[in-house]
Amino acid sequence: MKLTCMVIVAVLLLTACQLITAEDSRGTQKHRTLRSTARRSKSELTTRCRPSGSPCGVTSICCGRCSRGKCT
């Protein structure tokens, strides 16, 4: 009986701690879009681009622009 009461009290205490922590962290991430674009631009830097004169399309990335199927 004592063990059951101890388990119930422990579960209630942990639940209360999680709820308090969740309320405290609400609204701390102010610029969500900035983080996602920064992450995306970082991944774009690691991909290699095609030099000018190379063929381009949907799957290839040019260092400049893709014009009429060729990188410029």
Curated annotation (Swiss-Prot):
It holds the Pfam family Conotoxin. GO terms for molecular function: calcium channel regulator activity; ion channel inhibitor activity; toxin activity. It is found in: Secreted. The modification 4-hydroxyproline is found at residue 55. The keyword Signal applies. One of its GO terms (cellular component) is extracellular region. Residues 23-48 form a propeptide. InterPro entries: Conotoxin, Conotoxin_omega-typ_CS. Expressed by the venom duct. Keywords: Calcium channel impairing toxin, Disulfide bond, Hydroxylation, Ion channel impairing toxin, Knottin, Neurotoxin, Presynaptic neurotoxin, Secreted, Signal, Toxin, Voltage-gated calcium channel impairing toxin. Its main location: secreted. Disulfide bonds join 49-63, 56-66, 62-71. The keyword Magnesium does not apply. Residues 1-22 form the signal peptide. Omega-conotoxins act at presynaptic membranes, they bind and block voltage-gated calcium channels (Cav). Belongs to the conotoxin O1 superfamily. The presence of a 'disulfide through disulfide knot' structurally defines this protein as a knottin. The cysteine framework is VI/VII (C-C-CC-C-C). This is Omega-conotoxin-like SVIA mutant 2. It comes from Conus striatus.
